[in-house]
Regions:
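Conserved beta-strand core positions
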Residues: 5, 42-43, 147, 194, ...
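Conserved SAM/AdoMet-binding glycine-rich loop
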Residues: 77-81, 86, 188-312, 322
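Proteins enriched for Cys/Gly/acidic motifs involved in redox and nucleic-acid/cofactor modification
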Residues: 1-204, 243, 254, 258, ...
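Short acidic/polar active-site loop segments enriched in Thr and Asp
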Residues: 192, 228, 327, 332, ...
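Conserved, mostly hydrophobic/aromatic
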Residues: 179, 196, 232, 260, ...
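Terminal RNA-binding accessory module
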Residues: 336, 344-444
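Short, hinge-like loop/turn segments at secondary-structure boundaries
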Residues: 95-96, 117-120, 212-214, 248-249, ...
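Generic beta-structure capping elements
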Residues: 10, 82, 129, 154, ...
Length: 444
């Protein structure tokens, strides 16, 4: 009997890469991958365990899938990913309806586990977290023209609020030749946009080569035939060097986009977070990047309501947002994570944390709308992705998959999804851009 398996992957792009490797393992092991959950014999919930809201979403999804057992053909619910790794025995004990619970170091056992569970056995295993393989085939879980490429696993930064080192282990890079080979394989399959990811992408290579090799990796990936865009996500501010900035400025395929989660602006809050820097150093870095790459897009992530954040510290954070005017920004209310140093501190009330995060996003709205308005009149290369409400939509170099905005446009010519189209921006709709594709004769 062929077992049909579905996948629900939650959380970040790094977790999605793990899910894609799980799917490829199963397909290679004789399983049928099924997108219709009502027809699946088994479903995998690849969980996120990063912050409280993500944990709740993961648990709710597991419970929903468990409740669906008996409806249709579903016999097995398997739980993988960060929540399964972090809570191990607690998860198996508290949700006994889950038939399989695998820590990230046991992902290679997924086929064996599902076969046993479909026959009525429970399967629980937690291998060494640092044995999680970053190599192997992948079955892309998104559109076929872009992919995330995980260049490293784990993290050594030890930010005081973050549980990722507890879940994913120490930082460890992939050999450069392995990353390049994967990028070549993806390009051969028609992937034209490669998004390089890690917990700290700027640290890539330090553990293997004694120094960051991210600029060299970017140069090598940009040489691959068929690759059109190379994007770097998750840059640690202290490790954004002149060499990295100059590489992205010089390489035509490296998109002018920096994702730099700075987290805060107050020197003492950053110190309490076990991070470095202050508002001045962050502002200076952003100014330097903009001077070297005038059309660059700067994205950041902030945390509001960290335990030691005073009203003055929060005002400093607001000032950073107003001064730098990031082009893209996300702000999280601080989440108290078990077994982290920050969790032991006296906490700010949750309603205050959430309100502060809302204030940051309200401040950012002005900068984001101004940025969109400044795009009017520009011609942007847009990666067409689909059709909606009578118009095409896609992303420009300014938009990372899943997290940023869209460009909506009309066209006299038929547009194939996955193609790159020059689009004249004529208007805005909130954060999104509106435009018109240039006719083919206009682009000759």
């Amino acid at each position: 009997m062929t077992i049909k398996v579905g996948m629900i992957s939650l959380g970040c792009s790094k977790n999605q890469v793990d899910a894609e490797r799980l799917l490829a393992m199963l397909a290679g092991d004789g399983f049928t991958i099924c997108n219709d959950m009502t027809e699946c014999d088994a479903v995998i919930v690849n969980t996120c365990g990063f912050i409280e809201d993500a944990k709740k979403e993961s648990i709710d999804t597991i419970l929903e899938c468990c409740a669906a057992k008996g409806e249709g053909s579903l016999k097995c619910v398997a739980v993988t990913g960060c929540l399964a790794e972090r809570y191990r025995e607690e998860l198996a004990r508290e949700i006994p309806e889950a038939d399989v619970v695998l820590g990230i170091g046991s992902n290679g056992k997924i086929g064996e586990a599902i076969r046993k569970a479909v026959m009525g056995e429970h399967f629980t295993e937690y291998g060494e977290k640092e044995s999680l393989s970053m190599e192997g085939e992948r079955m892309l879980a998104n559109e076929p023209w872009f992919a995330y490429v995980k260049v490293a696993e784990g993290c050594d930064n030890r930010c005081s609020y973050c549980a990722i080192p507890l879940i994913r282990g120490r930082f460890r890079s992939r050999p450069m030749e392995n990353v390049i080979e994967e990028c070549k394989e993806l390009a051969a399959r028609g992937v034209t946009e490669l998004n390089l990811v890690a917990q700290d992408t700027t640290r890539y290579g330090e553990d293997i080569y004694g120094e960051s090799r991210l600029p060299e990796l970017i140069n090598a990936v940009c040489e691959i035939e068929g690759v059109h865009w190379v994007r770097i996500l998750y840059c640690y501010p202290d490790r954004v060097t002149d060499k990295l900035i100059d590489t992205i400025a010089r390489q035509p395929k490296a998109v002018h986009y920096f994702d730099i989660p700075v987290q805060h602006a107050s020197a003492h809050v950053l110190r309490d977070m076990n991070r470095r820097g202050d508002r001045r150093s962050i502002t200076a870095l952003c100014q330097k990047i903009r001077e070297k790459i005038p059309d660059v897009v700067l994205r950041t992530t902030l945390i509001a309501g960290f335990p030691t954040e005073s009203e003055e510290d929060f005002a400093e954070l607001c000032k950073l947002v107003e001064e730098v005017r990031f082009d893209r920004l996300g702000c999280f209310a601080y989440s108290q994570e078990e077994d982290t140093p920050a969790a032991e501190l006296e906490q700010i009330p949750e309603e205050v944390r959430r309100r502060r995060a809302e204030i940051i996003m309200e401040l950012q709205m002005s900068a984001a709308f101004d940025f969109a308005d400044r795009c009017t009149g520009r011609t942007l290369e847009v990666l067409a992705e689909g059709w909606e409400d009578g118009q095409y939509y896609g992303r420009s170099y300014m938009d990372a998959p899943d997290i940023d905005t869209r460009v909506y446009f009309t066209s006299e010519d038929e547009i194939e999804p996955g193609s790159y189209v020059p689009v004249l921006i004529t208007d805005t709709d909130g954060y999104d851009l509106i435009g018109m594709a240039k006719a083919k004769e206009d682009t000759k």
